[in-house]
Amino acid sequence: MVEQKGNILMKRYEIGKLLGQGSFAKVYHGRNIKNSQSVAIKVIDKEKILKCELMDQIRREISVMNLVRHPCIVQLYEVMATKTKIYFILEYVKGGELFNKVRRGRLKEEVARKYFQQLISAIDFCHSRGVYHRDLKPENLLLDENRNLKISDFGLSALAECKRQDGLLHTTCGTPAYVAPEVINRKGYDGAKADVWACGVILYVLLAGYLPFQDKNVINMYKKICKAEFKWPSWFSSDIRKLLRRILDPNPATRISVSEIMEDPWFRVGLNSDLLNKTIPTDKVDKVVHVDMDSTFGNLSNNINEGKQEAENLTSLNAFDIISLSSGFDLSAMFEDENSKEESKFTSTNTATTITKKLEDVAKNLRLKFLKKNGGLLKMEGSKPGRKGVMSINAEIFQITPDFHLVEFTKINGDTLEYQKVKQEMRPALKDIVWAWQGEQPQPQSLNEQS
């Protein structure tokens, strides 16, 4: 169905005016026909999220919103689906974004503290359930009719089960100005500590009316973030400065935790004791939404070709990932030591299938074992041990757009000189699929010129 004002969705909800839209979804005001309750209806296009490999992200968003049912978090009431659309029926928060309030000027200290207390309470609740938001910013903080805070947009959230064996998260997420130094570093990071950093940036913004880390040059901004280089507004009290110093600590190991923030004297002024409870009264939240994932998402994979099926397994890059992976913007050199693994990258206008086939052919010609892994990860291994064991190279394909990919080589094991030799032999053999090696000028070819 085409969503228009006055349409009835599955005989249960009346669709009202359009509230907002993005690349993959539109959000409408809605009304529950049975009880006249106002709701927000998020309409997601199945085909678009399938093409951009966001199906798992949508599934995760449903799972996360069921885990974090808290008065300061936007509630998910129901999930419905047709053959082409997925519908999230959400709590309607009519007070607008906290960002719009800050845009008119900085907040009074007691008002900023109230919102910060509610934010920390909700984040503490999320973390206690193994959920990390990873995209906290004023634009994702809404206000209800009573001017209470509601966290929204769990699309980038990570579950504790998404951690690797080292107990850390490894996917770069978030909005650059609010991202923690260790996330920019592109090493593993603690999701809880990264959320704490973002909360600190938000508190600064609420009290100052502007960001702590600003620069027209994004690289300079990242350097400031990594060094926690910012200035104190004259109106910041000593108690606020003391707390923010501990939150905006560039070292996650010594950065203050959520539980420590909740014990801070400035934080506890006028604190509502209900916010300290991880167990929320059942009358303040709605029941858990039970979703049949198979019927909601359907078997869409049968409707796509082999090339798209392969693309579904790739890692998708958001804008921050692309900046981080780009040679001109990669700040990892600021942190890595001489013993870090060697990497090289190239971009390609070919499909993932074509890139994989070419890499397999080149590996065979160089007498390397070739193995396909999940998530667009390919592995090449030498046939016999060298000075430092068997050389092992990972080649990972990232999708930037459906027609544009980034391939990253990483030496996992073996002798560096042997790796450099193999890499030099691979470069001319890969020329047919390489648009540009990172750090070099691209070939004079537009993305539209590919055959």
Swiss-Prot record:
Cofactor requirement: Mn(2+)
Domain Protein kinase: 13-267
Family affiliation: Belongs to the protein kinase superfamily. CAMK Ser/Thr protein kinase family. SNF1 subfamily.
Substrates-to-products reaction catalysed: L-seryl-[protein] + ATP = O-phospho-L-seryl-[protein] + ADP + H(+); L-threonyl-[protein] + ATP = O-phospho-L-threonyl-[protein] + ADP + H(+)
Region described as Activation loop: 153-182
Official protein name in the record: CBL-interacting protein kinase 10
PROSITE patterns xrefs: NAF, PROTEIN_KINASE_ATP, PROTEIN_KINASE_DOM, PROTEIN_KINASE_ST
One Pfam family linked to the record: Pkinase
Domain NAF per the UniProt entry, residue ranges: 304-336
Species annotation: Oryza sativa subsp. japonica
Keywords: ATP-binding, Kinase, Manganese, Nucleotide-binding, Serine/threonine-protein kinase, Transferase
SMART domains per record: S_TKc (SM00220)
